[in-house]
Amino acid sequence: MSKEERLAKDITHALGGSQNISNIIHCMTRVRIKVHNDAKVNYDELKSINGVLGVVEDERIQVVVGPGIVNKVAKLMADQSGATLAEETTENQSYKSQAEKRAYEHKKQFQSQRKQSKWNKVLKSIANIFIPLIPAFIGAGLIGGIAAILSNLLTAGSISGQWIQQIVTVLNVIKDGMLFYLAIFTGINSAKVFGATPGLGGVIGGTTLLTGITDENPIKNIFTGEHLAAGQGGIIGVIFAVWLLSMVEKRLHKIIPNSIDIIVTPTITLLLIGLLTIFIIMPLAGFVSDGLVYVINWIIGVGGIFSGFIIGAFFLPLVMLGLHHIFTPIHIELINQTGSTYLLPIAAMAGAGQVGAAIALWVRCGKNKELRNTLKGALPVGFLGIGEPLIYGVTLPLGRPFFTACIGGGVGGAVIGGIGHIGATAVGPSGISLLPLIANNMYLGYIVGLLAAYAGGFIFTYFFGTTKEMRNPE
């Protein structure tokens, strides 16, 4: 029996057996399991399993097994239990087990002190809707970026050839396979989160695309009299509509006789919510999303350096609190309406400031072997925009470096805001990994912002972010 097979078997047993597992997803280092009955889970046994680096007791039980094997363990658990398996993000790293273990120990301690509120539940719902789509966002965004680069080279005359134009066309078709039908994917995932039938959620998402509607035969906005536009209201409207759908469907399941439930319930649900979506939700959500996009672009455009500093400095605490997920639908709305999100490159500076702080700790605390071992695993992935090991394993537990990292993020954000017009064409990772997604060839500006954040985090941490105990541990 391989290590992965043993881990999967032992974890499944500690979770109360295969019958107690509802569904499984995994991120870069964790297997996240939704169980039917939490009382059947033996947490002591789960934590004692050889190969389990940590356990986070949350709405979804998070079992930390480390990078590289997490996808194998998750798949084996799904095969053994028959549970559905979805993938959040994937990673193929081989060195940072100590950093991951330290990070999740502190993360568990931090999360255990937080009171679960309705707001936290809303944030978890938003996260569960969009996290499974992150690989698709990244892949489609990068493909679109390649197509844009080739198109620019064609326009400039640097390259030529009909076959290159065909490649650009094909790449854009692949990209649009994700971005054009995002409302459908959002509807399906929203239905899963809200406990509705996924297919019905997808139909409601597809309804917002107004397929078949032409200028000669439009649907009018009942509030303004103007033609209703395809996708109006964006994913904000889709999420709200599917939430209503879930309540209607659940109610109908209770009152419709079993003999006709399979026919009557989906028909009535789709008809009712479909009409409500087209005539009420789309116009109102469109008003909200348009206003949101306008306000954010105005704040970034008018505020410039000041707005950039505030966003860059305060985004890391939002990540720490789990509040950063609320920005995902905002990024998507910005991209849908303007072609790029100016918010993401500024927010990405928070992670860069933390990298600068980590480099300063490496230089300043050379005698702290434990800290250096943690940094060996956490720092390389920090450059690529994966900041959790640094947050929970290094800066947050130490205290001071977390605040100096925030200042570094503010410095980078101020530079990005000062340069202006630096946007990202897709939602993706931060750090160096975001570079291919930068819009309008503003790559140099983004690099300058990154370097400024690195420098800011380094300088403030080097001079103000360490203590004698950090530098010379006993």
UniProtKB/Swiss-Prot annotation:
Membrane topology: Multi-pass membrane protein
Positions of transmembrane segments: 129-149, 167-187, 193-213, 228-248, 268-288, 299-319, 343-363, 378-398, 402-422, 444-464
Cellular localisation: Cell membrane
Broad EC category: transferase
GO cellular component assignments: plasma membrane
Origin superkingdom: Bacteria
Signal sequence interval, chain numbering: none
GO BP annotations listed: peptidoglycan turnover; phosphoenolpyruvate-dependent sugar phosphotransferase system
InterPro entries: Glu_permease_IIB, PTrfase_EIIB_Cys, PTS_EIIC, PTS_EIIC_1, PTS_IIB_1, PTS_Sugar-Specific_Components
UniProt pathway annotation: Cell wall biogenesis; peptidoglycan recycling
Domain PTS EIIC type-1, residue spans: 124-474
Protein name, entry field: PTS system MurNAc-GlcNAc-specific EIIBC component
Organism placement in taxonomy: Bacteria, Bacillati, Bacillota, Bacilli, Bacillales
